[in-house]
Amino acid sequence: IYALPTIPEIIKRQAINQKEKNIINNLVKSVSEDLKISNDNNAISFVPPYARYPYEIWVAPFKKVDCIKQLSDEEINSISNQLVSSIKRLDLLFDEPMPYTMAVYFPPRGFEGNFHHYIALQPMRRDKNKLKFLAGIEQISGLMLSDIIPEDAASKLKSITID
C-alpha cells in the first residue's frame, strides 16, 4: 500500500475521465460477452477491451460506488468471489501460480462521489515460460503491446473450470 503526497498525473486523468465521462461505470454496464469472464447479480470479472497486460482481469461491482465499504455484505461477497475465482483462473491458466500486480482503485481526494470502484489484476506471464516485461517501446511511449487480443484472453480464462 502506497500513500503519496500528491495525486500522480495518470491517476488524476483517470479520475477526471470517470467524473466527466463515467467510463468505468459505462464499461461495467455494457461489457461484451466476448470479454466477460464471470458475473452474478452484483459483480463482474472481465478482460478490459484495452487490456495493457495479457490476461489482465478487472473485477467490479455493478453498483457505482467509491469504495468497497459502501457495498452491502452480499455485494462484498460477490466481489470477493469474483476476485478469488479470477486469481484461481490465472493460476490454472498455465498450471502454476501466476505472479500478478493487484491494483484497487478508489477515488483520489476531490473526486469522491464520481468514481466507480474496481480491482485490476495485471498478470506477469504472457505464456507458460514467458514473463511480461515492459519493452523499450512500452516504457518510452506508454503504449502497451500484447501477445493476445482481449477477446481471446477472455475466452481462455472463461473456459477454465474452477473447483
Show which residues each predicted segment covers:
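HIT superfamily nucleotide-processing domains
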Residues: 1-163
